[in-house]
Amino acid sequence: MPLSLRLKLIASLVPDGARVCDIGTDHAYLPIELIKSGKAIRVIATDIREKPLENARKNIRKSGVTEIDLRLCDGLSAVEKSETDSVIIAGMGGEVISGIISRAKWLKEKPYNLLILQPTTSPEELRRFLIANCFEITSDTAISENGKLYSVMTAVFTGNKISVPEYFYYVGKVDPKTEDGFFYIQKQYRRAKSCADALFGLPEKKTEYLHFKELSEHIGRLLNYGE
């Protein structure tokens, strides 16, 4: 099964020779490709439900690869730190991903794991969580798939809490010079501007209005809208 554009991007971010943990593996298409391509030397593939793991098991048997270990568990609860150096959490909401990271205390222990994260919703909340918990977002790439825009980000724990402007949580390190990056940032701009427009003229909502107005102005500058 050929990988989707989104999964291809995720696979490209995996370091060569990695020991990967793929959370919420579903059909195990990504782990199979990582082993076949030689990107990963071993993959632990987890899912919280038995049915997806059964589908994964069938696909792994068909593929002929043997370096994939399937585990039924919630997030990283059945994974030891010594077993992995790269963790993929994709296809879930930003708040769900934050919860999985938060419960795996060993992600904050040396040697640090590379996190490859692809939220389907609330990417701004995931970025906010990462920054608040001393993770550095090392890359942030926008990708369009089936008419939807996603961000795929990499992060690593540093132990250093940094200060970032509010708009960073909405656009991260996405490059506006790429086509998908431009449209991703444009979407966030329109969202912030729409909120500001809806709140304009409401005295009891002045604080929220000013927040979204400033947010849209900062994001707009990234797109050279000149606000």
Residue ranges and their predicted role:
Residues 2-17:
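Conserved alpha-helix/loop element of class I SAM-dependent methyltransferases that forms part
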Residues 28, 32:
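Glycine-rich SAM-binding Motif I of class I
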Residues 42-47:
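Conserved SAM-binding motif I beta-strand of class I
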Residues 51:
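Conserved Rossmann-like nucleotide-cofactor binding loop
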Residues 54-82:
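S-adenosyl-L-methionine
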Residues 84-91:
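Short SAM/SAH-binding signature in class I
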